[in-house]
Amino acid sequence: MRSSLLFSVLGLATGSTFARHVHQMRADFNSAALPQAHSARGLPAADGKKGVLLMNRIGPSSSELYIANADGTDERKLLGNSSSFEYHASFSPDGQWVVFTTERNGDGNSDLYRCRVSAAANGTCSDLEKLIATPSVEDAGALSPDGTQLAFVSTENGYKTNIWVQDLATGERRNLTNTAEIAGDPLLPDGYFRPSWSPDGEWIAFASDRNTAWRGHGNGTGWEHTQELSVYAIRPDGTGFREVATKSGYCLGSPKWSTDGKRVVYYEITVEDTWNAHRPESVAAVTSAIVSVDFETGTDRVEHASGSGLKMFPQWLSGETDATDNIAYLIKGNDNEGYNYTSGATAAVKAAIRSPAWSSDGKFVVYEKVGFTARAQEKPLYSWDEDWEYRSTDVFPQLSLQGRLVITQKQLGNSSIVSMNPDGSDLKLVFDSYSTGELDSALVAKGLAGAFQPAWSADGEWVVFGLGSWFQSRATGKARVYRATSNGSYYEALTDGTVHSGFPSYSPDGRYVAFREWGLRYGIRILDLETREVRSLTNATDNLPFWSPDGERLVFTRKVSSTNFDVATIRPDGTDLQILTSSGANDAHAVWTADGRILYSSGMYGFRDEAAIYDQTFQPYGQIIVMDADGSNKRMLTDSLWEDSMPLYVPNEFLV
């Protein structure tokens, strides 16, 4: 959601008066400056669909499972040439099966499969079997000790992540945690993650953030949320729910059992570091510990591994249960990245892997290797709405009334602005982000600066946008509102840079530009392009204004409290303010559909996995929702494990 919501705390800016003499510059573009298209070009309109829903996803673009000996030797692909997009694997207690999550049914749709690995030495699985596949998230599967039941997490029936158990013989499944006794406050985090069976099959341990606070990173100042997890247990029939371990100010995740069932081990990390753990600029400095407690009492706390490094995915090996036995775990993100063992009997293995899990005898380890190459423009995605075909786009897509698509090439280029046909063909450069010499190339490379949120004029002749430093670099950088001709021949600055200004939108009649200011002043401003006069529409910490197609209202994001942002609308004369969302989590980056509905991104259903497990993301809980202009009829349009945002409907008439 950060690619779409990213501009509230990290991108708010405002400005109010401007010199009438704006900077005017002739664009001198060199064809060599044109960013790489990376586009799946010319995809036709989908048969039987109304058109395409373009959206952006922040998450890995590839993930492949591997199996190796515990010492790292004899590594091979688990699925051989049958690999698709798989992750989060685990062995059955008898070592005969590996359960894993796969998106082979569509990019973004996570389902659970298993394969037989009794002949692991030959390097590949056999007997590939689908366990559960629905449009909801299914993840983190774990087989019971007797092999008859599957514990897993799912967002089915309410979109929040809960612990489920499925009978493998009958297919019957039940939700263990979404009950009146267990479910937390619906306005607070209420997710349940990473189930693990006790050796006797009598208990399932898991982590949960139920009834914790929505808390921003940076001591509550950041837009993106941290996560506070405790360890809980429940019986497979849904009874006996209780807390096993908790620690104020800390996140306790991925619990696993000792082989005699007397202790539970987990990783322990500060709540603040759950943000740093999935940010590439900070993960190397994160420290965590591997800790266990007595299951019955929650006491007798033992630290098995501590010191520098982010340590995760602990798992007991060899059957011993005292403080000197062997626990395997992952080190993520620093120079020692790979997997390690507390006993020292097996040497540490340096490897760029994620989510390792070991066979119960400790002989084999399974894990994934992920890639983050940007998805191609127009790459097909899983579609949750049968009327629309979902495809990938770079950020800030907008369709002109003439049917031309404009985007910022943040993932596929250098945050310049390009236009194209909606099928990805006929790519043209509108504005090179380096044209004015204002941007720091290092910040552009990190995605912290660029030409953001291009918006069309009604006649398709102009594109307005913000140019400058964004996110955390906004605090010391500048940003101005610009516009450029759609053919890239000319551009001009519309604000003078005195106040950080950005995220503009054209009025339907083409006379006005709405934008936000941040820093010296806050709020939404409206610039009259004929007179160059500016007036204040709001004076709060508002952001991301967008004019409705009929010009009667603007939708925007408002900071309604120190920890929460909501979607609001207002008339262009400043009257009739309406707050349309109230989830308790962030709701933001709203845009209008052509028929006057509102698309936006939301964290209202909470995290889909433990926050520290993610990589290179901002708000991994972000999903896309559509609602009517008055805030009614809210409906989820995505249900993935990843950060989804930047929606745009493209009707078939523009794709043929």
Predicted feature residues:
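Beta-strand-rich domains and repeat architectures in extracellular enzymes and scaffolds
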Residues: 31-70, 74, 83-90, 393-398
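Fungal secretory targeting signals
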Residues: 1-21
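A flexible loop/linker signature enriched in serine peptidases of the S9 family
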Residues: 57-64, 80-85, 101-113, 131-137, ...
